[in-house]
A protein has these predicted regions:
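Non-catalytic terminal and boundary segments that flank Rossmann-like NAD(P)-dependent oxidoreductase
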Residues: 1-25, 274-316
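Canonical Rossmann dinucleotide-binding motif of NAD(H)/NADP(H)-dependent dehydrogenases/reductases
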Residues: 13-53
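Conserved glycine-rich Rossmann-like NAD(P)H-binding loop of the short-chain dehydrogenase/reductase
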Residues: 48-64
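The beta1-alpha1 cofactor-binding region of Rossmann-like NAD(H)/NADP(H)-dependent oxidoreductases
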Residues: 59-60, 81-93, 125
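Substrate-binding pocket helix/loop in short-chain dehydrogenase/reductase
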Residues: 119-120, 127-129
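Active-site helix of classical SDR
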Residues: 143, 179
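SDR active-site lid
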Residues: 193-257
Length: 316
């Protein structure tokens, strides 16, 4: 009966809850804020009176976002930092500096993404490791640094941005798919730990979105078929922001993505692949075992695997 009661309560909250919480004076750290979705989210947070802390890689920077927010908000309420989030030491120093110069971070938005597009056999182990550091371990490092101050006050919100690669794997995107699906498990685990610990004032939100009209889409659009057009940044950001403000644990934009786990569960694997190939370009090389052995000399003790060019960026 308790399960039924909780389900009814959750359904009622999902349908009827429209009261958005006040985030004025919350200190919000947003990674990958230099452009794309991170920039759009930063603007929305600033419009609601939050103290916005921008963070992006040195090669991208935050000058454009800083200028946009400064025209909305007082300059003293926006702070900009650069950091290689794939570097554990830099992440640690970043958080310590923010806590000293700005204050305790009460909202964390894990948005930064490094997109690497390579076949699993054409990607070096170092490339795969760097992708995991930037896309998965960066969120882990940030949460480990920031969560203790949230727990002391029983107040905070951890948000993680996920793309479509969090709900289904795509050929030639093994590194980012591994990282993003790992983030789903990380967020669910953290939420469970907070519940077990009685921290009812700390919330988590995982946001899955369809691909967006950003520079990453321009880099990777040859991989996708235009069955479902990309979402605009403004639309996606507003939907995700609303979910954050009503403390929703999981949000999909568009809602069609809620059906993907269900469809994967009931359809034969080959049937789901047919659906997947209507969304993405199915021209992924498929080799027989003999062809693989010949192409990559897998029986040899030393392998030389040719590397393709990869597209990398620091924000969505």
């Amino acid at each position: 009966m308790e399960i039924v009661h909780v389900c009814i309560q959750a359904l009622s909250h999902y349908i009827f809850s429209t009261t958005e919480k006040n985030i004025r004076n919350e200190v919000v750290l947003i990674t990958g804020s230099g452009r794309g979705l991170g920039q759009q989210m930063a603007i929305l947070f600033a419009k609601r009176g939050a103290i916005v802390v921008l963070c992006d890689s040195p090669d991208i920077g935050n000058s454009e976002t800083l200028e946009l927010i400064s025209s909305i908000n007082n300059e003293k309420r926006v702070h900009a930092y650069t950091c290689d989030i794939g570097n554990r030491v830099e992440v640690k120093l970043l958080v310590e500096r923010i806590q000293t110069e700005v204050g305790n971070i009460t909202m964390l938005v894990n948005n930064a993404t490094v997109l690497t597009s390579n076949s699993i056999l054409d990607m070096s182990e170092d490339e795969f490791s760097r992708s995991l550091n930037a896309n998965l371990f960066s969120a882990y490092w940030l949460i480990r640094q920031i969560l203790p101050s949230m727990m002391r006050r029983n107040h905070g919100h951890i948000i993680t941005m996920l793309g479509s690669t969090a709900v289904f794997g795509l050929g030639n995107f093994s590194a980012v798919c591994t990282a993003k699906s790992g983030l789903v498990g990380l967020m669910e685990s953290i939420d469970h730990e907070l519940t077990l610990g009685g921290y009812d004032g700390i919330y988590t939100t995982a946001a899955v979105s369809h691909y967006l009209t950003t520079h990453l889409f321009q880099l990777s659009k040859t991989c996708f078929n235009p069955v479902i057009p990309p979402l605009t940044l403004d639309y996606a950001a507003k939907k995700i922001m609303h979910a954050i403000l009503i403390n929703r644990k999981f949000v999909c934009v568009p809602r069609l993505y809620y059906l993907i786990p269900f469809v994967k569960g009931i359809l034969p694997a080959r049937a789901f692949l047919i659906i997947l190939n209507t969304l993405v370009n199915p021209k992924i090389p498929i080799y027989t075992q003999h062809e693989l052995s010949s192409k990559h000399n897998l029986t040899s003790s030393t392998q030389h695997i040719p590397r393709k060019r990869s597209h990398m960026s620091a924000c969505q």
